[in-house]
């Protein structure tokens, strides 16, 4: 074999080996990618399994038990000193201040009122002395009220076979051809939307009291009374809400069995809107809608031009001429959900409104390999919530100044840290990181106004109030029932937020609205913050003395 042939052969061998090496490297690369994907899939499946276990067997709340003592080798974190603020325990006098007092005099029997020594008649030394007190509860009483009309005739005119008659005025029925009274309907609404008691349970309760009223009748009472008497107040609250500068919004699911064009098992939504921390009386409103389209908040909030605090649901982007302020609690929740189960047990999420004394959270800046990224993300969020708790009682302008001074540096470090992360594709950490990156501007928008809150928890708490009823009732039978529930819940939650007696407020509306539903002047006096309502709906009420035919007149 010639020298040239040997070179050509060697060249072919080298090219063949190089081709094989390239193929092997490509195969190795593909296998590595496949291994990474399988690891990612395994991690995602483990996260999903852990989430299912938590949903079925664990608590769903973010709140966790107090952290246990760490092992000796775990890093010790130095924290700033703090003073525990123990909430003062209320006295009996404070707890029972609004209850009527009835005194029972315990006297000495007649046969024992003579002196054992001289048999003289004994007399009282002074006024009876207080010994103890107890709380007595009188069960509800249901009774039938028969309105009997007096008819007068002139006896002199009767002699001439010509009668002059006068009849006593009988109050109009709340609902024509129905035995429903203001107290009965208010009682039903109160137990439905304040106590979360479904109609069938109310029917059972009334049966125990001697009144056999079908659940369908109770539902019809609420639907008709809501539409005829409560709707004008609801609409007036809506007008006032639109004028505000800050509104919280949220939505939660519900089910309506009989809705045209929808299957009974399909999902509908109850939308919640709550006024912000603007120093004005609180307004809470619910609106039923068959879906989750952004057109629903767009229509409900038409005319509102201010700050809309919500979660990062894209539907709110349809609301025009507003600044979206997204909820930082949602962002924190994403990082919290990315934590392993054992880490969740040792991490406590800070609550701005809690009275519990808290240590200032420390954000790890050294030995980062000892911490998982989700743990650091929660630490950044907790730091922001801790600062918010320190500033929550400041005037809005001062609060804004302090926010810019104290929280901007935390945000800058947080966002810079996010840019260093490259989480596994599809895992919960990636979802948390992408959530924070994609919504960083709207998450920080609360810094622009000292009246804004860092979270949308105000609206979420209102959603939970409805969720209690939903858990008990499971569904609404009709669209009319869902709309009635939205109206009643709006008035109940607004009354609660303004420190009114809820039953008394609903009862007062049903007493007065039949006489002023056509005019707005009377409605102004029936709004939760009016002087008339504060005077008559802040304590207890006696429905036997305040009735449809005997109640104070509205101011002129």
Named regions from a protein language model:
Residues 15, 19, 112-113, 151-153, ...:
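Catalytic center-proximal scaffold of phosphoryl-transfer enzymes
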